[in-house]
């Protein structure tokens, strides 16, 4: 996405806007045409099409094209815009699973942490590692990855092995401007999409993938040692 937030001050008398901060709205592979609205309780909500013209517009065998992102609440804090899933999503939380202070070395899975329609928060509270990856929509053949590469100060989202058309855009690499030792990722996983809200919505990554729904495993991969807290809810719409 090339859509940007411009934060600053506006002088009504001179009709001049003074730019103070510029930030990307979404760093993922599929994000287009965002719009905002204001709710009755004065929240600013953003919605957009989760699709890119560089991606496969219409999945083979399907009668739909792209999808909408989950509506996001926008807030300004310390001169920057933070994004978070609308709070109403919590009304659809079911089957909560929690783990605290779990050690991740190599490849790990946790009982109850799987699925294709869910809301999961991962806190990396400590440890010593160069790379940490969360693989979703996974089976023996397919997976989509979100990676923190601390030694390169870089974030990556990679759907190369999701079963997508090979010539489509598959990897997005983003420089982490404020490297840190503690990370918080909130991942909204839908049947054919993933939205990652990094560090309370300082950065957001949206991507589609068209992996078979039978691929529902989630793995955590660390090249050193990481201490993580996990909280996961299925999203169930009656």
Language-model segment annotations:
Residues 12, 19-238:
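Beta-rich accessory regions
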Residues 1-21:
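Active-site neighborhood of glycoside hydrolase catalytic domains
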């Amino acid at each position: 996405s090339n859509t940007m937030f411009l934060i600053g001050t506006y002088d009504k008398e001179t009709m001049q806007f003074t730019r103070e901060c510029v930030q990307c709205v979404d760093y993922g592979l599929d994000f287009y045409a965002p719009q905002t609205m204001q709710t009755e309780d004065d929240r600013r909500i953003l919605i957009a099409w989760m699709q890119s013209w560089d991606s496969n517009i219409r999945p083979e065998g399907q009668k739909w094209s792209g999808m909408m992102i989950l509506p996001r609440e926008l807030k300004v804090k310390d001169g920057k815009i933070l994004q978070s899933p609308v709070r109403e999503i919590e009304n659809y939380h079911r089957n909560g699973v929690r783990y605290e202070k779990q050690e991740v070395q190599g490849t790990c899975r946790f009982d109850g942490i799987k699925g294709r329609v869910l809301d999961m928060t991962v806190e990396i509270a400590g440890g010593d590692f160069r790379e940490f990856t969360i693989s979703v929509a996974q089976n023996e053949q397919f997976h989509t990855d979100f990676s923190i590469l601390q030694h390169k100060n870089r974030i990556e989202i990679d759907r190369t092995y999701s079963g997508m058309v090979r010539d489509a855009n598959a990897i997005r690499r983003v420089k982490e401007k404020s490297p840190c030792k503690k990370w918080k990722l909130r991942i909204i996983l839908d049947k054919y999409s993933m939205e990652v809200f990094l560090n309370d919505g300082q950065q957001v990554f949206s991507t589609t993938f068209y992996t078979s729904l039978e691929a529902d495993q989630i793995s955590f991969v660390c090249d050193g040692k990481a201490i993580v807290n996990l909280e996961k809810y299925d999203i169930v719409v009656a």
